[in-house]
Amino acid sequence: MNTILLIGGTGFLGSHLLNVLLKNHEDIYVVEHKKKIKDVKELRVIRGGIKALNSGMINKIRPDVIYHCARPTVPKLRKAGRKIAAYKAEKLNSRLLNELKKSKVQPSLVFVSGSLMYGNSKEAHNEHSGLNPISFARQYFKGERPLVSACFRNDYPVQILRFPWILGDGSWFKWFYMEAMKKYRAIPSFGDMKNTMQFIDVHDAAELMRLYATKAPAPGIYNVFSDQSLRQEDFVKMLSKIFRLPVKNYEEIFTKQLEKEVQEAFASNIVLNTSYPDILDKYTFKSLHESLDSLK
């Protein structure tokens, strides 16, 4: 049994990861911030958020792995809020790394990132591709910078897992598709719809976080994705068939003007590739149709 420390266990991906860890009977410590951790007797809760973690606590807990799924948010301020959140994240992640480096244990740190960090390209991105953050990632990158730097300097065992569009009942799909379908009875489209989108089910993403923590050959950056990629036009057609609703340009649906970052993200052409295909050789992914059908 491994000892696990989970940061961000109430979020979209973090809550699914917590279920995976519980299913595998890990010894789990969970950091609680504003939102309450679910009441499960197997969990040990650390209150006070990421600021509560220090080298002394790490030495006491002696985790084998720390999973980091948290990101500060100030949603009411939109772009300005993301800039504030990125500044906070940079400070918090720098402090966390410093405390981990001071500890006697120095557990591996597994951090969640996304494919928007690579930016638009007709070519697939592998782990050695340069970063060109677009959309929301322009602000998020500042918060991730201490962890990316640690990877490149190789001065602490950090894994950064970059996922494509994570599909589930929450996050982007809930905000921009499910809520639009319920409220406006239509499916939004963005741009000319010729861009390729790549998907992974949230349950698979959570399972694979645990897999990479144990099977990845070394610290570093890993692109984690399934082979499920579609042009946006085919994605919205699939949604239209499953939910039996028409496809309309987003400007016909949303009464308030969406931020340009939203439009840029959904019209972006980003496909992941990997230099480490062996890690996923025996993994069976949930199909895109199955994922969408489960959200009806």
Roles of regions detected by a PLM:
Residues S94-F136:
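Conserved Rossmann-fold NAD(P)-dependent oxidoreductase catalytic core, especially the SDR/UDP-sugar
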Residues Q139, S171-M178, F190-A213, G220:
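Substrate-positioning beta->alpha
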Residues I4-N24:
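N-terminal Rossmann NAD(P)H-binding glycine-rich loop of SDR-like oxidoreductase domains
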Residues P246-N249, V262-K296:
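C-terminal amphipathic/interface module of NAD(P)-dependent oxidoreductases
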Residues S149-T196:
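NAD(P)-dependent short-chain dehydrogenase/reductase
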Residues N132-Q159:
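Active-site Tyr-X1-5-Lys
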Residues A206-V262:
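Mid/C-terminal beta-alpha module of Rossmann-like enzyme folds, strongest
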Residues L43-R95, E99:
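NAD(P)H-binding glycine-rich loop region in Rossmannoid oxidoreductase-like domains
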